[in-house]
């Protein structure tokens, strides 16, 4: 990830898992401030907003990156409504709380940029990820409304429809060890591009193609996505079959995943 030492004081919110990456920023001459918060907690969000406002006068750029993903078909989710509640609480309400809390500071400074890390799954309507995709789609819908309201206030909004990235979030799904994914550096470069150019949306060609097919040929899109749904089954845990041995991906699965690089299966 390229780092340039402008007069910036990044404030990072998260757990200790990313501490090893801070050295790169510090070596570039940036002053890093870290804060720990549970974004799904209203109290933590409110406290974080207060801290950022009092200590730094708010923020110029907010990147909503925290997220929870659940890979489970709807038929295996009938008794797991809490999956939908948990994804909404973090991916939508948590991001919304932070954004709403920090927007007044951007308004007073007459500048700001909100970058929301969404998913390619919103563009492709990825099956087996209904809880995750719905929560990301909710944030996208709110972002479009907000962008229209603040278009004349020098506050920009960017949505990044991130493809599948090789991070600890996908590690429970062993299938992803065999399919092509973005590296964390490649994902970070998309965020850097958003900061520099302030696009309304950043998406891969596959994501844009998926959205076009869903808009212009919805039945064809459903057939394609149903094919992927049947080709890549739920994990044993998601299907309530704990203890069954993990099955390595077939040649057909690997070939399909290579063609659809970055897609959620």
Predicted regions and their residues:
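A glycine-rich helix->loop->beta "capping" turn
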Residues: 28-31, 51-62, 70
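The beta1-alpha1 cofactor-binding region of Rossmann-like NAD(H)/NADP(H)-dependent oxidoreductases
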Residues: 36-47, 81
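Conserved mid-core segment of classical short-chain dehydrogenase/reductases
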Residues: 69-85, 128
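Active-site helix of classical SDR
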Residues: 99, 135
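Residue(s) in the substrate-gating loop at a strand-loop-helix junction
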Residues: 119
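Active-site-adjacent segment of SDR/Rossmann-fold oxidoreductases
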Residues: 124, 145-156
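C-terminal helical subdomain
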Residues: 159, 176-215, 231
């Amino acid at each position: 990830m390229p780092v340039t030492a402008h007069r910036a004081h990044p404030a990072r919110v998260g757990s200790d898992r990313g501490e090893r990456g801070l050295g790169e920023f510090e070596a570039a001459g940036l002053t890093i401030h870290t804060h720990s918060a549970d974004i799904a907690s209203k109290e933590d969000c409110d406290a974080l907003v207060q801290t950022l406002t009092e200590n730094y006068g708010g923020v110029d750029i907010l990147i909503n990156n925290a997220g929870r993903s659940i890979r489970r078909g709807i038929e295996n989710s009938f008794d797991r409504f809490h999956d939908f509640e948990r994804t909404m609480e973090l991916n939508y309400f948590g991001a919304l709380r932070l954004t709403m809390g920090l927007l007044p500071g951007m308004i007073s400074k007459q500048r700001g940029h909100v970058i929301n890390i969404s998913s390619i799954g919103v563009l492709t309507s990825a099956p087996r990820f209904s809880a995750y995709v719905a929560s990301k789609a909710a944030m996208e819908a709110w972002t479009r409304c907000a962008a229209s309201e603040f278009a004349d206030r020098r506050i920009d909004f960017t949505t990044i429809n991130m493809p599948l990235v090789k991070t600890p979030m996908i590690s429970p799904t062993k299938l992803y060890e065999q399919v092509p994914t973005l590296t964390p550096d490649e994902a970070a470069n998309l965020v850097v591009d958003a900061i520099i150019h302030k696009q309304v949306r950043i998406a891969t060609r596959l994501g844009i193609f998926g959205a076009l097919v869903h808009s212009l040929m919805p039945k064809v899109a459903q057939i394609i996505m149903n094919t992927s749904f049947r080709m890549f089954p739920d994990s044993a845990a998601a299907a309530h079959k704990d203890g069954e041995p993990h099955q390595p991906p077939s040649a057909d699965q690997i070939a399909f995943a290579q063609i659809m690089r970055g897609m959620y299966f």
